[in-house]
């Protein structure tokens, strides 16, 4: 059975590096992991923009992209990715949800 990482990449608007965030892990099929990620994308409330006017969600090859337009004219991009775990140096344990 495969283990899938549901990741969020939220690069800073000014090009500063921000680490990816592990939203959840799913053991099972790619389809079940995609369904879980799809639901997380729909429920995700980004911290920016503070006053969102419009949110668009696009399907990509490995997940989804969310573009949020703010009231002041800025746009913020969020990339949600589905990644299959290939190797883990830690103990084999139960998947843990880190996104609430």
State where each predicted segment sits:
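Generic "edge-of-domain/loop-turn" microfeature
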Residues: 13-15, 31, 73, 87
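Short beta-strand-to-loop capping motifs
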Residues: 25-28, 68-70
């Amino acid at each position: 059975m495969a283990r899938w990482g549901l990741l969020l990449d939220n690069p800073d608007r000014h090009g500063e590096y921000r680490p990816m965030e592990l939203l959840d892990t799913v053991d099972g099929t790619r389809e079940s992991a995609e369904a879980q990620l799809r639901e997380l994308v729909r429920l995700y409330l980004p911290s920016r923009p503070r006053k969102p006017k419009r949110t668009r969600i696009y399907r990509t090859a490995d997940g989804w992209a969310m573009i949020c337009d703010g009231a002041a004219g800025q746009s913020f991009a969020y990339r949600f990715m589905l990644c299959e775990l290939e190797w883990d140096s830690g103990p084999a344990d139960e998947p843990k949800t880190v996104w609430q």
